């Protein structure tokens, strides 16, 4: 990976990536309707090549005789008709499973296709399926969303995918909400694919819309519901301008935290359903959640009906310990600045004065105290107490190793405008010199740092060692 001359700005991972991998390979035969499940650490590389037959990785078909490399991945290769794989490298664990959720996924896909066909038949007067996937942590929500997106793209649909889980990013860093239209396959090695900042790619890059949340859980702070409202407005407006995407609808991935509920009340789920006009609500891995939501959305007006569907949690879902999740978040941040695999990037190091940065730090608090389910008939962002959303901060040593979201707002804009503004990009604070009142920054591209409002959150956590 390249360094910037004289600055030693190569990424410094917590554990060595691309560690020596065994050159010994083995062949794995898979019978029809089985899948090869594996877990590989960030310090090792697993390679998989399809020798014969057909197979898919979260819905995306593997190309024959093409080697795919995986690091820090927990995944599964499924085959409908049987295949032969060539496997190399070291894994933490792997096995072949005969019981898989893929038939249920296929049935769900065909049900969504019927709704898309209805949208086409109506001349796009009706929107396609508006899907929200909910469930506890580690229940396979993101995997299901990937499969549904891949299957839709393979049938020439262009669904919109929305990520409302701040614990892991989609085409952005953790701590953000993002949305993107998918008209091509989902990348196998890079997860959701790449954005224009990631450099050249054999798969068309995605153009995500990003809002910065900056907190770990939806229950924190005062910005979750306003940002959901803003994202819903942006997505539905975009679909009205794009007939193909409107027919395909959208799929929303959510945080497991919103599925915990309080006494059978799921405020954040209800808010998402209301703002996005969700009509298909998929529950994973929780009988109680399914029962509560079925009761909530039973006997509604047909024009506002919400179909609650229960899917079983896949046996391939594993608990991801906090150590793994932290390594995953740091890897996503490194990839944002330095690229992925062979597609390396050369970020720019810049030094600026304290006065050049207009930083607004999120004030954490009890969001639930502000928005109880019975307070308002409908949520209104104008009811938020704006004075306590952000506090203006001056650079200090505590800012080192943190990320700043550069918004499209001006620093003189009101706090609600700053909150609702999309993100232009992120910069990394490499060093703060209080004596000279200088800040050294790492930026994805050269040029002057914009004078826009910058948002500082508490999530993701600081990433030490990103630069030397």
From Swiss-Prot:
Record-listed ATP binding positions: 35, 74, 138-143
Family annotation (InterPro entries): Clp1 (IPR028606), Clp1/Grc3 (IPR045116), Clp1_C (IPR010655), Clp1_C_sf (IPR038238), Clp1_N (IPR032324), Clp1_N_sf (IPR038239), CLP1_P (IPR032319), P-loop_NTPase (IPR027417)
Keywords: ATP-binding, mRNA processing, Nucleotide-binding, Nucleus
Example of a GO biological process term: mRNA 3'-end processing
Pfam families listed in its UniProt record: Clp1 (PF06807), CLP1_N (PF16573), CLP1_P (PF16575)
Region: Disordered, residue numbers: 1-22
Subcellular location: Nucleus
Gene Ontology molecular function, alphabetical: ATP binding; polynucleotide 5'-hydroxyl-kinase activity
GO cellular component terms given for this protein: mRNA cleavage factor complex; nucleus
Subunit structure as annotated in this protein's UniProt entry: Component of a pre-mRNA cleavage factor complex. Interacts directly with PCF11.
Family: Belongs to the Clp1 family. Clp1 subfamily.
Physiological role: Required for endonucleolytic cleavage during polyadenylation-dependent pre-mRNA 3'-end formation.
Record-given protein name: mRNA cleavage and polyadenylation factor CLP1
